[in-house]
């Protein structure tokens, strides 16, 4: 058995683009033969997968799943929208979303969770990259839970049940009848998909974002040429408006365009004859915050020729 050195592992990694542990295993399996190790990685699809992993993945699917009083949302990205229609990819997203209910929303822990049929989520993802032919990434996950009540899932324009481009979870705590909670929860979920709140409450808004809005408002108000005290009131008003428009409980319900969400919940509780509290929510929009690569056809061909 040839000695597998760190230098050899490093060289193979540079040749193949595969991970360190995969390179070490390849060298072990081929008794240190570098070219044979490259071929071994290629036959396993690992070299190809690693090469594809450098490409931007900003399409894909968001999945939502609920079990009892717990819900999970997961985003898995691919390079093109075409892959989102692939049955194998859809099955993977659906399965990982269900696994998140027990594995939790730490992406590293979820990636290391056991996948049905053997291996881990991460290993299944690597296999999918090789077989489907596009880079894919497990981007994020979020789990919400209530002690008593319900978690309501919603997918806007679902590609298939539970999967789409915008996934929402609404966590409602209380002792009101579950059917009544699910009705108002579905309405609020649709509101969240459309209104894009940044936090549950005004106090939950990012202070950095608030200060940025304050600075913008101050600059605009200063241009008015009004007295300082008037300028300050203008700034305060602009910030208050921003807070109200971006905190879920303060937002005006999109369905009637007049009732704050907090009041919508209170009205539902009163009508149901029980308590309902909007405890938490999740809104995942596919590719949100990812800068997509743009290139023309000629550039793509040239890139492919260069390898």
Curated annotation (Swiss-Prot):
GO terms for molecular function: translation elongation factor activity. Keywords: Cytoplasm, Elongation factor, Protein biosynthesis. Gene3D superfamilies: 1.10.286.20, DNA helicase RuvA subunit, C-terminal domain, Elongation factor Ts, dimerisation domain. Pfam families: EF_TS. The keyword Cytoplasm applies. Associates with the EF-Tu.GDP complex and induces the exchange of GDP to GTP. It remains bound to the aminoacyl-tRNA.EF-Tu.GTP complex up to the GTP hydrolysis stage on the ribosome. This is Elongation factor Ts.
């Amino acid at each position: 058995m040839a000695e597998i050195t760190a230098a050899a592992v490093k060289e193979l990694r540079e040749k193949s683009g595969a991970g360190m542990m995969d390179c070490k295993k390849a060298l072990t399996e081929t008794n240190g033969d570098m070219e044979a190790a490259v071929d071994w990685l290629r036959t396993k699809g690992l070299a190809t997968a690693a090469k594809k992993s450098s490409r931007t993945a900003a399409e894909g699917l968001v999945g939502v799943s609920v079990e009892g009083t717990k819900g999970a949302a997961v985003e898995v990205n691919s390079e093109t929208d075409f892959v989102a229609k692939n049955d194998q990819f859809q099955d993977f997203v659906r399965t990982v979303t269900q696994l998140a209910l027990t594995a939790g929303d730490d992406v590293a822990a979820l990636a290391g969770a056991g996948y049905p049929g053997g291996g881990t989520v991460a290993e299944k993802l690597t296999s999918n990259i090789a077989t489907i032919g596009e880079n894919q990434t497990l981007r994020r996950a979020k789990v919400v839970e209530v002690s008593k009540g319900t978690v309501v899932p919603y997918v806007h324009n679902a590609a298939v049940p539970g999967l789409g481009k915008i996934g929402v979870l609404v966590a409602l705590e209380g002792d009101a009848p579950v059917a009544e909670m699910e009705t108002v929860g579905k309405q609020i979920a649709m509101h969240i998909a459309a209104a894009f709140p940044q936090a549950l409450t005004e106090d939950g808004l990012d202070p950095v974002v608030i200060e940025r809005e304050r600075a913008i408002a101050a600059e605009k108000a200063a241009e008015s040429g009004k007295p300082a005290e008037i300028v300050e009131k203008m700034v305060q008003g602009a910030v208050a408006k921003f807070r109200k428009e971006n905190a879920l409980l303060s937002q005006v319900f999109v369905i009637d365009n007049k009732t704050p969400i907090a009041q919508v919940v209170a009205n539902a509780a009163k009508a149901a004859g029980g308590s309902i509290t909007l405890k938490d929510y999740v809104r995942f929009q596919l590719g949100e915050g990812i800068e997509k690569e743009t290139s023309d056809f000629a550039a793509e061909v040239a890139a492919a020729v260069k390898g």
